[in-house]
């Protein structure tokens, strides 16, 4: 694959991945924990959920800011990806403690701990100048 085409493919993949934190972050800021169903929530839980949703949305903005000049955004992408992986490790820890989230959360876990590191490795390949 030509370098320009591979770069555009990585940009498209990252842009697609940004839809999750942007979409779910925004939905969580608006709906609070009601977005995942369940019973009544106290004001503190609602506030905390909205705050974390705002952080999630912000992380999506940081990732989206890497798309236009993906080859030059190594440090920014790695920091953001590190936050995603850390969140995935927290989710995995909950799973190990007996939490039984929905299938959607299992898919998110796979993306956080599988897809995210692969995107970082792919970006490192794109950021490296081709050998002469």
What do these predicted ranges mean?
Residues 72-83:
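Membrane-interfacial loop-to-transmembrane alpha-helix junctions, especially the N-terminal start
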Residues 39-46, 100-111:
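Non-cytosolic membrane-interface motifs at loop->transmembrane helix junctions
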Residues 19, 23-27, 45-67, 82-86:
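Core segments of alpha-helical transmembrane spans in multipass integral membrane proteins
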Residues 1-20:
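Cytosolic juxtamembrane helix and N-cap/initiation of the first transmembrane helix
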Residues 89-106, 124:
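Membrane-helix boundary connector in multi-pass membrane proteins
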Residues 26, 63-64, 91-93, 117:
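Alpha-helical transmembrane segments of multipass membrane proteins
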Residues 114-132:
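Membrane-water interface at the C-terminal end of transmembrane alpha helices
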Residues 26-36:
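Short membrane-interface helical motifs at transmembrane helix boundaries
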């Amino acid at each position: 694959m030509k370098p320009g085409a591979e770069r555009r493919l990585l940009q498209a993949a990252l842009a697609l991945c940004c839809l999750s934190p942007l979409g779910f972050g925004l939905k969580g800021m608006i709906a609070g924990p009601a977005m995942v169903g369940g019973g009544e929530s106290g004001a503190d839980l609602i506030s905390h959920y909205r705050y974390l949703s705002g952080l999630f949305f912000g992380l999506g903005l940081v990732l989206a800011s890497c798309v236009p000049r993906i080859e030059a955004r190594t440090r920014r992408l790695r920091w953001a990806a590190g936050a995603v992986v850390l969140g995935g490790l927290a989710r995995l820890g909950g799973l190990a403690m007996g939490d039984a989230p929905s299938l959607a959360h299992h898919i998110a876990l796979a993306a956080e701990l599988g897809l995210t590191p692969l995107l970082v490795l792919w970006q490192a390949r794109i950021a490296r100048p081709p050998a002469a």
